[in-house]
Design a protein with these regions (language model features):
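Short, conserved beta-strand element in jelly-roll/cupin
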Residues: 36-53, 69
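A hydrophobic/aromatic-rich effector-binding and dimerization subdomain
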Residues: 2-24, 75-147
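Conserved short histidine dyad/triad with adjacent acidic residue
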Residues: 21-38
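Short, Lys/Arg-enriched, Trp-marked, Pro/Gly-tolerant hinge/linker segments that flank
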Residues: 120-132, 145-211
Length: 213
């Protein structure tokens, strides 16, 4: 039996550009992304059907037209909920958006995100026009990511798009304060993490619910 990796150890993208985009289509209602977490943000946009997103604290049914923001370090899983579904996912390290020269933008908007003082909002309750606006940007970023035309400045365009999404969120005052101890910066493990780690260490053994409790 192969060792089951419950935590994604590898960073997405490349060291030169920590960004990766996915277009996930399910035609049999069996889409499944098992519980995992990473130190990168993840943006979701459902374009067809519906999927179920489960995190440590909530279960969300995301339907066509909805977006969702997953903060770095949040354990999550995705499940197909309709016979046919499609969604985009963007995964990237927040430092991708950092400026070489420290300025008011870095200080006022980006640094609170990098430090964990501000968290992305869930996004599933946004007004339809906001969801469409952000969703279209997510789709554009995914298409650019897979564009192999060397004449297209894809990485630059993707970075601009991500900043545009942040601009929309800041203009709507949508970011959430995290308190003094940022959730994803904390040295404490989430309640699910010890469970995942125990399974990973004992995957060849018979595991009971009592052992996981």
């Amino acid at each position: 039996m192969n060792k089951i990796h419950l935590q994604k150890e590898a960073q997405h993208g490349t060291p030169q550009f920590r960004f990766q985009a996915f277009s996930q289509r399910d035609t049999c209602g069996q889409y499944f992304a098992p519980y995992h977490w990473h130190d990168e943000a993840e943006f979701l946009y459902v374009t067809e059907g519906s999927i179920t997103l489960r995190t440590e604290n909530s279960t969300k049914l995301l339907t066509a037209g909805q977006i969702y923001f997953i903060n770095p370090g949040t354990a999550h899983a995705l499940f197909g909920n309709s016979e046919v579904s499609h969604h985009y996912a963007l995964v990237f390290g927040l430092e991708l958006l950092s400026f070489a020269q420290y300025d008011v933008c870095q200080n006022r908007y980006l640094e609170p995100l990098f430090s964990g003082k501000l968290l992305f909002p869930p996004g599933d309750t946004f007004e339809p026009e906001t969801s469409v606006q952000i969703g279209q940007l997510i789709a554009q970023a995914e298409q650019l990511y897979h564009n192999t035309d060397p004449a297209v400045p894809a990485s630059l365009s993707i970075k601009i798009i991500l900043l545009q999404i942040l601009e929309i969120l800041f203009s709507r005052q949508a970011f959430l304060p995290s308190g003094d101890n940022a959730r994803w910066k904390s040295s404490e493990e989430y309640s699910l993490r010890p469970v995942f780690e125990y399974i990973e260490q004992h995957y060849q053994e018979r595991i009971t619910l009592e052992q996981l409790s």
